[in-house]
Amino acid sequence: MNSQDLKKRQEKIRNFSIIAHIDHGKSTLADRILEKTETVSSREMQAQLLDSMDLERERGITIKLNAIELNYTAKDGETYIFHLIDTPGHVDFTYEVSRSLAACEGAILVVDAAQGIEAQTLANVYLALDNDLEILPVINKIDLPAADPERVRHEVEDVIGLDASEAVLASAKAGIGIEEILEQIVEKVPAPTGDVDAPLQALIFDSVYDAYRGVILQVRIVNGIVKPGDKIQMMSNGKTFDVTEVGIFTPKAVGRDFLATGDVGYVAASIKTVADTRVGDTVTLANNPAKEALHGYKQMNPMVFAGIYPIESNKYNDLREALEKLQLNDASLQFEPETSQALGFGFRCGFLGLLHMDVIQERLEREFNIDLIMTAPSVVYHVHTTDEDMIEVSNPSEFPDPTRVAFIEEPYVKAQIMVPQEFVGAVMELSQRKRGDFVTMDYIDDNRVNVIYQIPLAEIVFDFFDKLKSSTRGYASFDYDMSEYRRSQLVKMDILLNGDKVDALSFIVHKEFAYERGKIIVEKLKKIIPRQQFEVPIQAAIGQKIVARSDIKALRKNVLAKCYGGDVSRKRKLLEKQKAGKKRNEGYWFCRSPSRSLLECSFNG
């Protein structure tokens, strides 16, 4: 193809993604679009086709973004090339959404005709507006008995401020309105800008590791053209590689002769080292490099930290390799090595939220077959010392001595909770119990209320979401953003087993709740730890002060049972032997206690 043909082809390209709150029908709509454009044969079609991970299918959520190419013949008789980038809906995967949107010019905003606008709908719309995307509202599930499309249309206009007069009324499940959506994409989503004759600039928006071909980059070509045989260069580190294959996903990988401006596809270049590529980096040609890198992505800072340890210590290197491969595919995951007296060698990992942490743990166990122990989640505290230093602490075991601490600041988030009016009282009570400060409350319509609180992140990462769902019978939707750091009365609580501190069980708690939390954990540990042949005291301590204690009574073994009579010195000898054995056991009894159960206890305490 010459330059003129490529420019004509570029005018026919439409790059778009689908954004929505969880369960508003995003993946189902993607399935219907694939069917309508005959991208996938009816034999290969299955529900949630783009959710290729088993975990995504089981949980019914999208975790990873997916990009596929479709061809659509519009009513004007022209054939258009669509690049559909499917995105997750959960707050923990906002980073995936922002990466998808950076590769698009338009976004289909799916809103449930019965539930209306939810907290995550708003968060995703603001991301799309930040990227200057053309937003096409779609009111989905109009075939539900509780559907009220007109009310939702007004909500879209009043709450988001988008013109919803031309919003498509659709039912992805029943296949209603799909053609109308495709026609709107053709008419309203702009073709990609960019110059096919300019030096190559390709944005890496995702990557995946292949055992045979190395790292495979998923890219959006912003300027220029790339083809097999080209020598490409990473603009962040200057590393060069020879392109072996380029292609697109349909959703299977299909090789192509080239990828040109506006295309979304993959590039394989025998990249063997995971560290050589970074999501958000710019790829250019080594012999004709671009003058500057593309804007890339804002680096996401982890909000929740936890220790990950292999149950078998010889799996430490396997765990490191597994984390590196997951990080390639999930740039928001961060990790560094750490050691624990109780658990040995492992990693301190940073996550965007609890669901993100849960998904990473499950992927490590399933995809890499490593049995893990996770410590209780923690957040980043700012500890100000008496010598006027500020230390960032994400691991309770790194907390300085209490005598050196002047004051501690903890992260607060702005929590936006959308809830039916009848549950407002329950939401406010829960938020206040979690040390939240009320900010404001708006009525979206006659029945639904948007409540905003400032809540400590540490309270949210434990059980806030579960408690919110149970206190509102599942009707509340929730979204949060980092707000600020505030001074708080925080203390480090240590758990002592048989007089020894167990570093993996330490946690940070507000002074007000210290006694209550300490008592709960001590009682739980008493039930979990098996009885020994000696008494084991379990204590919760703040510094030198013991705030809660419980004892596991000794298990008595009668070593004299086999002595029916005989000399007393024989009996004394057996008792002395038992006493020596008990003393020897005291040193390493913890190694045999169920460490996974201990950590689950501290996690749920």
UniProtKB/Swiss-Prot annotation:
EC number(s) reported in the record: 3.6.5.n1
Membrane topology: Peripheral membrane protein
Subcellular location: Cell membrane
Residues reported in the UniProt entry to bind GTP: 23-28, 140-143
EC primary class: hydrolase
Keywords from the UniProt entry: Cell membrane, GTP-binding, Hydrolase, Membrane, Nucleotide-binding, Protein biosynthesis
Catalytic activity: GTP + H2O = GDP + phosphate + H(+)
Domain tr-type G: 11-193
GO molecular function annotations of the record: GTP binding; GTPase activity; ribosome binding; translation elongation factor activity
Superkingdom in the source lineage: Bacteria
GO cellular component: plasma membrane
Family of the protein in this entry: Belongs to the TRAFAC class translation factor GTPase superfamily. Classic translation factor GTPase family. LepA subfamily.
Annotated NCBIfam families: lepA, small_GTP
Function text: Required for accurate and efficient protein synthesis under certain stress conditions. May act as a fidelity factor of the translation reaction, by catalyzing a one-codon backward translocation of tRNAs on improperly translocated ribosomes. Back-translocation proceeds from a post-translocation (POST) complex to a pre-translocation (PRE) complex, thus giving elongation factor G a second chance to translocate the tRNAs correctly. Binds to ribosomes in a GTP-dependent manner.
Full protein name: Elongation factor 4
Organism this protein belongs to: Streptococcus pyogenes serotype M4 (strain MGAS10750)
Primary gene name: lepA
